[in-house]
Curated annotation (Swiss-Prot):
Highest taxon above the source species: Bacteria
A GO molecular-function descriptor: structural constituent of ribosome
Listed name of the protein: Large ribosomal subunit protein uL6
DNA damage recorded as keyword: no
Oligomeric and partner information: Part of the 50S ribosomal subunit.
UniProt cross-references to InterPro entries, sorted A to Z: Ribosomal_uL6-like, Ribosomal_uL6-like_a/b-dom_sf, Ribosomal_uL6_a/b-dom, Ribosomal_uL6_bac-type, Ribosomal_uL6_CS
SUPFAM superfamilies listed in its UniProt record: Ribosomal protein L6
GO CC terms, sorted: cytosolic large ribosomal subunit
Family affiliation: Belongs to the universal ribosomal protein uL6 family.
GO BP annotations listed: cytoplasmic translation
Known role: This protein binds to the 23S rRNA, and is important in its secondary structure. It is located near the subunit interface in the base of the L7/L12 stalk, and near the tRNA binding site of the peptidyltransferase center.
Source organism of this protein record: Lacticaseibacillus paracasei (strain ATCC 334 / BCRC 17002 / CCUG 31169 / CIP 107868 / KCTC 3260 / NRRL B-441) (Lactobacillus paracasei)
Length: 176
């Protein structure tokens, strides 16, 4: 049984959390995030600690999810989130043209992508992409969209992958 909903969230100095109806806003040194939360779950703030209580066991899943989401928001406005990706394959390269990310990954045309608001894309080298921002959900979603342009294939391992991702390799046909 998960007890994540009962864990206390420590609010660091410089971060303010305000509740306005069903919306909770977190402001910090890196920016501001607002999210809608279930009205049935009550938020209690005592000094620099926040905890949540639920009315009954039917809200177990929502209880843990709300606590995890608020903790992700606090971490986002203080430290931020970052996904590092690399391109593996002959001729595969990435470049930044203005606000667009341009990927040449073996198609007959370059793939152009625009990062969502609040997400910054850096291309330190032609085979490396760094996606960063304050919202864990938006950063992860955009990284998944970039990866889906050319997901790593199991035979040669070519494609766009996360730096810490392990691609399971398959053996090719043996032939006669």
């Amino acid at each position: 049984m998960s007890r994540i909903g009962y864990k206390v969230i420590k609010v660091p100095a410089g971060v303010t959390i305000t509740k306005d109806g069903d919306n909770i806003t977190v402001k910090g040194p890196k920016g501001e995030l607002t999210r809608h939360f279930a009205p049935e779950i009550e938020m209690h703030q005592e000094g620099d600690e926040i905890n949540f209580t639920r009315p009954d066991d039917s809200y177990k899943a929502v209880h843990g999810t709300m606590r995890a989401n608020l903790n992700n928001m606090v971490v986002g406005v203080t430290e931020g989130y970052k996904k590092e990706m690399k391109l593996v394959g002959v001729g595969y390269r990435a470049q930044k043209q203005g606000e667009k990310l341009v990927l040449n990954v073996g198609y007959s045309h370059p793939v152009e992508m625009t990062a969502p608001k609040g997400v910054t894309v850096e291309v330190p080298s032609t085979t490396q992409i760094i996606i960063s921002g304050i919202s864990k959900q938006v950063v992860g979603q955009f990284a998944a969209v970039v990866r889906s342009v050319r997901a790593p294939e199991p035979y040669k391992g070519k494609g766009i992958r996360y730096v810490d991702e392990h691609v399971r390799r398959k053996e090719g046909k043996t032939g006669k």
